[in-house]
């Protein structure tokens, strides 16, 4: 039986990866790259698409490599221990705006973003795989997953809530604020990742892992449960990706900037932080809810139903800051559903890994969890790319100043652009939630 101390240590891993690094990449990077760093919509969209093609190769290789690692620290833990420092350092560098021309900035952004994705894979794939070797008890897997999600959402809440206040405290230009904030958060992420690697335990020895081959990866397509799980993971990250990536544009253009309510500065990061704390609370409810409705897949199904209803309702709120309270209320309600299905997702991946070992006779834990990480990055990045492309399609144009920096032309933000932004936060996620319902209902593992 694992101790509370170990479960908290495990939670720190996703507090760093999900609550800091991925949260900032999801919600702040689209706006940062176009409005601060100076990339065009097209450059930002292509950057994320290129990174996804890169991940298609690196993620499964990393999963197989992690499965075959043998060291004094175990199979998966050394990747967290020794990957923690480059993880935090590269994240910090990615939020720095160098004094370069347009071409130099493109090279810097593309190089650092791809490197960040590689290091994220190097740390997060073994982290996810840890769940398969820390315990073989299904209920305890759910508990570890719940701790993981609580850690991620608690840190996500702290990150998003503190973001505008950190920037205000740092002062200076937007570029300087992002750079210093990135350095602070990078240090915190590195420390959390290292502590996670040092204080967790691998109690189970993985079943023999085959040397990686693309044939081995192709064999996953014979695993029906893995196919459903991959589709569900992509959809959950599409759902979250649309909402997080467009939130900054929604505040800038639909609500005309930050909203102040009783001295509380509500910008796009604080707005989404209300959802983070809700997810944190309901992440702890997920194991109980799964028992209540009879299975993980049905808990997933009903949480997707809730997300569908609340997302559609958000579309009908007027684009007026006077309704900020109602907007926050619906973000909280939507996050109740997200908070329930998020920990179940990773617990279900552990079930898929067990299913694969039972039916195929070899361990593919790292490979299967790497596909989960790849799905996470694929869904988030493609949604970010689509947002950039759809805003351009709706009529938003970029202008270039005398220094070669690009930004959105305010004159191009027409009513069609505003409706597109509003829909990307509400109707697009609603359609994804509908697909999630169907996939969860048909998921073949019933426990």
Regions found by a protein language model. Give the residues of each.
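Membrane-embedded alpha-helical bundles of multi-pass transporters/translocases
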Residues: 1-447
């Amino acid at each position: 039986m694992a101790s509370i101390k170990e479960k908290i240590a495990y939670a720190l891993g996703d507090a760093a990866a999900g609550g800091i690094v991925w949260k900032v990449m999801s919600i702040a990077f689209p706006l940062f790259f176009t409005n601060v760093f100076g990339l065009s919509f097209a450059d930002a969209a292509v950057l994320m698409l290129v990174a996804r093609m890169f991940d298609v190769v690196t993620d499964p290789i990393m999963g197989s490599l992690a499965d075959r690692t043998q060291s004094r620290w175990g199979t998966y833990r050394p990747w967290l221990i020794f990957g923690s420092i480059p993880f935090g350092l590269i994240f910090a560098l990615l939020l720095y705006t160098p004094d370069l021309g347009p071409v130099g900035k493109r090279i810097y952004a593309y190089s650092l973003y791809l490197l960040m994705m590689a290091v994220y894979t190097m740390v997060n794939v073994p982290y996810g795989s840890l769940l398969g070797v820390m315990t073989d008890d299904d209920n305890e897997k759910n508990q570890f997953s719940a701790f993981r999600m609580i850690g991620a959402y608690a840190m996500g809440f702290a990150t998003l809530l503190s973001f505008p206040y950190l920037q205000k405290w740092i002062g200076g230009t937007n570029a300087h604020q992002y750079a210093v904030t990135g350095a602070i958060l990078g240090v915190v992420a590195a420390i959390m990742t290292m502590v996670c690697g040092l204080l967790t335990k691998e109690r189970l020895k993985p079943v023999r892992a085959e040397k990686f081959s693309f044939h081995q990866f192709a064999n996953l397509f014979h695993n029906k449960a893995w196919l459903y799980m991959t589709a569900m993971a992509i959809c959950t990250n599409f759902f979250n990706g649309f909402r997080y990536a467009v939130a900054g544009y929604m505040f800038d253009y639909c609500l005309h900037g930050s909203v102040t309510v009783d001295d509380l500065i509500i910008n796009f990061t604080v707005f989404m932080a209300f959802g983070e704390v809700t997810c944190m609370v309901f992440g702890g409810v997920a194991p109980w809810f799964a028992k209540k409705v009879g299975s993980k897949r049905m808990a997933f199904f009903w949480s997707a139903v809730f997300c569908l209803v609340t997302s559609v309702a958000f579309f009908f709120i007027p684009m007026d800051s006077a309704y900020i309270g109602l907007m926050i209320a619906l973000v909280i309600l939507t996050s109740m559903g997200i908070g329930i299905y998020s920990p179940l997702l990773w617990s279900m991946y552990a079930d898929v890994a067990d299913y694969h070992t039972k039916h195929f006779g070899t361990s593919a834990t790292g490979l299967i969890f790497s596909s989960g990480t790849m799905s996470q990055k694929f869904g988030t990045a493609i949604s970010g790319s689509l947002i950039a492309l759809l805003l351009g399609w709706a009529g938003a144009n970029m202008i270039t100043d005398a220094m070669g920096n690009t930004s959105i032309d305010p004159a191009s933000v027409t009513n069609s652009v505003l409706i597109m932004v509003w829909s990307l936060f509400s109707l697009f996620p609603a359609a994804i939630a509908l697909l999630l319902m169907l996939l969860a209902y048909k998921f073949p593992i019933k426990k």
